[in-house]
Amino acid sequence: SDTTQAVRNTRRLVEEGAVAVIGSTITPNSLAMIDVVAEAKTPMISLAASKDIIYPVDAKRFWVFKTPQTEELMARAIVADMVARGVKTVGYIGFNDAYGEGWARYFEAELKAKGLELVVSERYNRTDTSVTGQALRILARRPDAVLIGASGTPAVLPQRTLKERGYRGLIYQTHGVANPDFLRVGGKDVEGTLLPAGPILVAEQLPSSFPSKRVALDYIQRYEAKYG
């Protein structure tokens, strides 16, 4: 999560003649790396989510690509599910960095478009060990649902704290937690979590009519055959 180190590593790679750079897996680092790869005219494939990594497609971002879905796309899916479940009021707590701010921006815009009310918005750092203050402020507003704009295992902390403090509403996470480590660290505290994910993660559960099911299953089979 050190943007300075990410830039340093990227510069070293392009100076050593790398024909492409794969990374970073997080939004702040990926954004910091753009200037380096653009200057070197070296393609970069980011594994982070933010739409800002690739848009607007200007002279610098011409060299940048990414694999995950954008937060804008996933925010639409989350809000659509909230509407379907009758949610009226929503709370948000996200990383105090480009990932959390990007999610807050697109999520709030989608809430407004669908007529839902954002009643509280909080931030925390990836390395924080307590979010009690933020959780209490969220609980005071009594939202029907809360979205945690975080990724990886640090996304567990707000959810665990809300549960421990008695929150009984719906808790949503981003596609940044769609991995075994989140489930391992979260344990019972993340039971019932709602989150969006790309079709490849649930390929076997998709109906046969789903357009990309066959392609997803083929990819999984090939990947597991080679890498286990």
Where are these regions (language model features)?
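Mature extracellular/periplasmic domains of secretome proteins
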Residues: 10-15, 36-39, 136, 164, ...
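A local structural motif
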Residues: 17, 115-123, 142-145, 167-168, ...
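Extracytoplasmic ligand/sensor domains, especially the bilobed periplasmic-binding protein
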Residues: 4-5, 18-122, 170-198
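Second-shell loop/turn segments in exported
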Residues: 19, 61-68, 136, 204-209, ...
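Hydrophobic alpha-helical
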Residues: 27-38, 144-165
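Extracellular/periplasmic periplasmic-binding protein-like sensory domains
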Residues: 162-228
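Internal alpha/beta domain cores that form substrate/cofactor-binding pockets in large enzymes
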Residues: 118-122, 134-141, 154-170, 175-176
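Short, well-structured alpha-helical segments in soluble
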Residues: 3-19, 80-81, 129-142
